[in-house]
Curated annotation (Swiss-Prot):
Record's keyword terms, sorted: Cell membrane, Membrane, Transferase, Transmembrane, Transmembrane helix
Organism of provenance: Mycoplasma genitalium (strain ATCC 33530 / DSM 19775 / NCTC 10195 / G37) (Mycoplasmoides genitalium)
Entry membrane topology: Multi-pass membrane protein
Spans traversing the lipid bilayer: 18-38, 53-73, 91-111, 213-233, 243-263, 274-294, 302-322
Top-level taxonomic group: Bacteria
Protein name: Phosphatidylglycerol--prolipoprotein diacylglyceryl transferase
Record-listed a 1,2-diacyl-sn-glycero-3-phospho-(1'-sn-glycerol) binding positions: R162
Pathway: Protein modification; lipoprotein biosynthesis (diacylglyceryl transfer)
Any GO BP: lipoprotein biosynthetic process
Length: 382
């Protein structure tokens, strides 16, 4: 790669150059981690070393996936450099997102289902007619909640990291017609503001005597806008179910990349990136639809048993598996009605944070815990 002279930040020992690309990408990763930790502690009120351990895993898988994806899409930076030498570029963020998503699903499914990471809430159950008994209800935290927590933070990391492409003078757009060695003519167009507000960007986008569209700047701008909307605003929108925020990230980054990829210079154009962007959009739309309309019904036991019962009916229609056992079908139908009736309604808090699809395990309070509960009840009602 023919890098500009100002792409090197400094040299170590006089012979090992440290590139601005690596520094800026590192800053983007650190800033994304800070946003993750902030929401983890102050918004979700979760503090556990296992969450911080995932940060270490995510950084490694993000870099590894991005590096491998450069090979998949045919990036010349991958072929011309050592695998671990990505100071000169060769990181495709889409691959990092894919690999980290897979690892995250595996990690959090194991981690959140462990006994030490179940949440307990005090509930009141009516025993007999008039006796109220306090109990602990133990639930699993949904993986979708973790998706809401982590995914939006990646956007701000991408927004910052895109500036590394500027210092490497890569991932720019095609040349604007009629700009050959004529900065004054371009200064009177819509890109003239760069000459005043960002003179370094203005100078850096003149490549081979022609002005190139600063795609890094455009993508960084829209990534920042979507980050603010998804990270700060969507949590306050009534009716947004868990998982919707996380899948909104896939939809947003897919749309941004799909539009901007078509304006890239042919040197940096990869058809695989177009396909991956479409995949992200499809995953985002299907994920949002599932979280908003399907998953919330599956959490309602009525709909869970309804789908199970419907499945058995369809299976019985096409096969003879259940046709000769009418008694079994009758028992299933009775269980379907019996289990669905007392569980039709759930609180918004449960629907938002505890996507449990199985019956919660109930623990009776000890006498000491019961006394504490009575004291708390007396304080809150006085």
């Amino acid at each position: 790669m023919n890098r500009p002279s100002w792409s090197t930040a400094f040299n170590i020992g006089g012979g090992f150059p440290i590139q601005w690309y690596g520094i800026i990408v590192s800053i983007g990763i650190i800033f994304a981690i800070l946003m993750f930790v902030f929401k983890l502690i102050y918004c979700y009120k979760l503090q556990d070393n296992s969450f911080y351990f995932f940060i270490f895993i995510a950084v490694l898988t993000m870099v590894l996936g991005a590096r491998l994806w450069s090979f998949v899409i045919g990036d010349s930076n991958f072929a011309n450099n050592n695998f671990f030498d990505f100071r000169n570029g060769g990181l495709a963020i889409q691959g990092g997102i894919l690999l980290t998503s897979i690892v995250g699903v595996i990690y959090f499914n194991f981690f959140l289902n462990s006994k030490t990471n179940k949440t307990k809430t005090i509930a009141e159950l009516l025993n007999n007619k008039n006796e109220i008994k306090a109990v602990y209800v133990e639930r699993n935290i949904s993986v979708l909640v973790m998706l809401d927590l982590i995914a939006p933070c990646v956007l701000i990391g991408q927004a910052i990291g895109r500036w590394g492409n500027f210092f490497n003078q890569e991932v720019y757009g095609f040349a604007l017609a009629g700009t050959m060695n004529d900065p004054q003519a371009l200064a009177n167009t819509q890109w003239g503001f760069l000459k005043i507000l960002m003179p370094k960007v203005w100078d850096g986008m003149w490549i081979d005597g022609q002005f190139r569209i600063p795609l890094f700047l455009i993508e960084s701008f829209f990534n920042t806008i979507f980050f603010v909307l998804i990270y700060f605003v969507m949590d306050f929108i009534r009716g947004v179910k868990s998982g919707t925020i996380g899948f909104s990230y896939f939809l947003a980054t897919g749309i941004i990349r799909l539009i901007l990829e078509n304006f890239r210079d042919q040197t940096f154009y990869f058809q695989t990136s177009i396909t991956t962007s479409i995949l992200f959009i499809v995953v985002g739309i299907l994920g949002i639809f599932y979280c908003q309309f399907i998953h919330v019904k599956l959490r309602n036991y009525f709909w869970t048993y309804f789908f199970l019962y419907a499945f058995y009916k369809v299976a019985a229609f096409f096969t003879t598996l259940f046709l000769n056992n009418r008694k079994q079908m009758a028992q299933q139908k009775f269980a379907f009605y019996e289990k669905s009736l007392p569980n039709k309604k759930r609180s918004f808090f449960e629907m938002k944070y505890y996507n449990d699809v199985t019956t919660p395990k109930i623990y009776r309070l000890t006498d000491q815990e019961m006394k504490l509960f009575d004291k708390l009840e007396a304080v809150t009602t006085s």
